[in-house]
């Protein structure tokens, strides 16, 4: 099995619900290590840059508005097959379709306020981690 890193964001809705610790526990119980972490209130410019891949999509403005509506907690996770493992923990994008026991099924309210973001591939994980954490601030353990 490959040791990978993935980026995870606990979005403003989940931060406001004070479930950060519960989400971290799920990461750690699944064998993922938190190798970098920080809380940040994204600027509009940073949110637009981070989600630039979606700029032409009809939901882009609403996504950016939501992501700047409150602080987020950003973490780099490391472990065997971290990307797939993290995506399994998150559940389907639409919490109504997410399996019971997933983060989105348990903590998300809607397809827009869906509690968490996760990288979808090794290439995007590398870009997303670098966006929030200069390499010197990520610590394998």
Curated annotation (Swiss-Prot):
It comes from Paraburkholderia xenovorans (strain LB400). It is an enzyme of class 2 (transferase). The gene is ndk. Its EC number is 2.7.4.6. Its cofactor is Mg(2+). It is found in: Cytoplasm. This is Nucleoside diphosphate kinase. InterPro entries: NDK-like_dom, NDK-like_dom_sf, Nucleoside_diP_kinase, Nucleoside_diP_kinase_AS. Belongs to the NDK family. The active site is at residue 117. The keyword Ribosomal protein does not apply. Major role in the synthesis of nucleoside triphosphates other than ATP. The ATP gamma phosphate is transferred to the NDP beta phosphate via a ping-pong mechanism, using a phosphorylated active-site intermediate. It catalyses: a 2'-deoxyribonucleoside 5'-diphosphate + ATP = a 2'-deoxyribonucleoside 5'-triphosphate + ADP; a ribonucleoside 5'-diphosphate + ATP = a ribonucleoside 5'-triphosphate + ADP. One of its GO terms (cellular component) is cytoplasm. It holds the Pfam family NDK. GO terms for biological process: CTP biosynthetic process; GTP biosynthetic process; UTP biosynthetic process. Homotetramer. ATP binds at residues 11, 59, 87, 93, 104, 114.
